[in-house]
Curated annotation (Swiss-Prot):
PANTHER family: ACTIN
Keyword hit for Cell inner membrane: no
Protein's UniProt name: Actin-like protein arp10
Family annotation (InterPro entries): Actin (IPR004000), ATPase_NBD (IPR043129)
Keywords assigned by UniProt, alphabetized: Cytoplasm, Cytoskeleton, Nucleus
GO biological process: dynein-driven meiotic oscillatory nuclear movement; microtubule-based movement
Species in which this protein is naturally found: Schizosaccharomyces pombe (strain 972 / ATCC 24843)
Family under the similarity heading: Belongs to the actin family. ARP10 subfamily.
Pfam families found in the cross-reference section: Actin (PF00022)
GO cellular component: cell division site; cytosol; dynactin complex; mitotic spindle pole body; nucleus
Cellular location(s): Cytoplasm, Cytoskeleton; Nucleus
UniProt xrefs under SUPFAM superfamilies: Actin-like ATPase domain (SSF53067)
Residue ranges of the TM segments: none
């Protein structure tokens, strides 16, 4: 137990295996609670709050010194579940609750690269994340002499046209307002982004495709016959992909899998990625096809990468597939704690300053924004 009551940011990660909790300044979580006994994909709020309370009382011997709780959700949950969990924690602990969109930044932290597609293969879900290169958008706004709002309006127009072609719901004005606020916070965020090696202008359509993953995401549940899925994917019923990926690509993830799941590398994932590439402009397709980064247990199997690369090459996409540099279970927790430290410009003698020093970022969407009646982005 710590002798002094330190002002602290507590990081809590919830994934499909357990709850991890620790101080943001620590390199690894202090506690782990196994979720297997609960036999469910979602954790009751009462369990999470109880664990946080016990940890804080045991570590700090008090609850009053907690400044913020950063909640890392490395699991597929609905927007309603996220809001209920944040509200429940806030009502119990009475401290700001910050939600962490772990996938995009975790990918950046684990690969230290740009222009890559992250495929996060989990036991219960598969995520596709396109890494953002913010320098390109900032350069675009400068060289075109257009305001950020104008650029966003044009991107929104492209989004409307794209949705119209696919007979999808048009982007509402209020959703665009959220997107605009999100983009502004992106541009002033302290989250580091690798500098681009070659700055170039993007057309409006290219700008949309380049940054379309910050627009609303479609949370799609893919139900297929278990006999069509490999044993490694018996629980993989949920896929989270951007709404602009064709539905055919979503379904393709579970097509052609044999009983052992060995065809995932040879058929399923190549099918999805090809569906993604087909809807990208050629220039953007070239950029995004440079690198595929895989996280998860399945890609760690011997020969998996070679089989995947051979299949993609035979289909005309000579890409490079690599594992994430950080493959530990605590990748999301480490990413959250690292970013918390970088975004906390704190003075230990000024608790009030620390309380207001977290920079706005789409990667850190606080419960106080919910509390103030602000709408969360649809993709959140």
């Amino acid at each position: 137990m710590r002798k002094n009551c330190d002002i602290s940011t507590v990081v809590v990660q919830i994934d499909e295996f357990g709850i991890y909790i620790g101080n943001a300044s620590d390199k690894e979580p202090t506690w782990k609670v196994d979720l297997v006994p609960y036999k469910q994909s979602w954790v009751p709020i009462s369990i999470v709050t109880t664990i946080i309370q016990r940890y804080c009382l045991n570590t700090f011997n008090c609850l009053a010194e907690i400044v913020r709780v950063v909640l890392v959700l490395d699991i597929f949950v609905t927007r309603k579940q996220k809001k209920e969990l944040c509200d429940g924690l806030f009502n119990t602990l009475n401290v700001p609750i910050t939600l962490w969109i772990c996938a995009p930044l975790t990918a950046i932290l684990s690969t230290s690269t740009r222009d890559a597609i992250i495929v996060d293969i989990g036991m219960k879900e598969t995520k596709f994340i396109v890494i953002l290169d913010l320098c390109i958008l900032m350069h675009y706004t400068k060289t075109s002499k257009r305001s950020l709002s104008t650029v966003l309006e044009r991107m929104a127009d492209c989004f409307k046209l794209n949705n119209k072609k696919n007979s999808q719901k048009l982007l509402e004005d209020e959703e665009f307002a959220v997107t605009e606020a999100l983009m502004k916070s992106l541009l002033k965020s302290r989250v580091p982004s690798k500098p681009t090696e070659e700055l170039y202008q993007l057309t409006d359509q290219e700008a949309y495709f380049r940054y379309s993953d910050i627009l609303p995401l479609a949370e799609t549940t893919c139900q297929t016959n278990k006999t069509e899925r490999g044993s490694s994917f018996n629980d993989a019923e949920k896929i989270r992909v951007p709404s602009w990926i064709a539905n055919a690509g979503i379904e393709a993830l579970f097509e052609g899998s044999d009983a052992g799941g060995s065809d995932i590398a040879d058929q399923a994932l190549p099918n999805v990625l090809l569906s993604l590439y087909r809807i990208l402009p050629i220039d953007i397709r070239r950029i995004m096809s440079k690198l595929i980064v895989f996280n998860g247990i399945l890609p760690s199997l011997p020969g998996w990468y070679q089989r995947f690369q051979n299949e993609m090459t035979s289909r005309g996409l000579a890409i490079k597939a690599v594992p994430g540099q950080t493959t530990a279970d605590m990748m999301a927790w480490n990413g959250a704690s690292t970013t918390c430290e970088s975004q906390l410009d704190y003075d230990p003698d000024d608790p009030k300053h620390l309380r207001h020093s977290i920079v706005e970022s789409p990667l850190l969407y606080g419960q106080d924004q919910y509390f103030n009646g602000e709408n969360a982005p649809e993709w959140w």
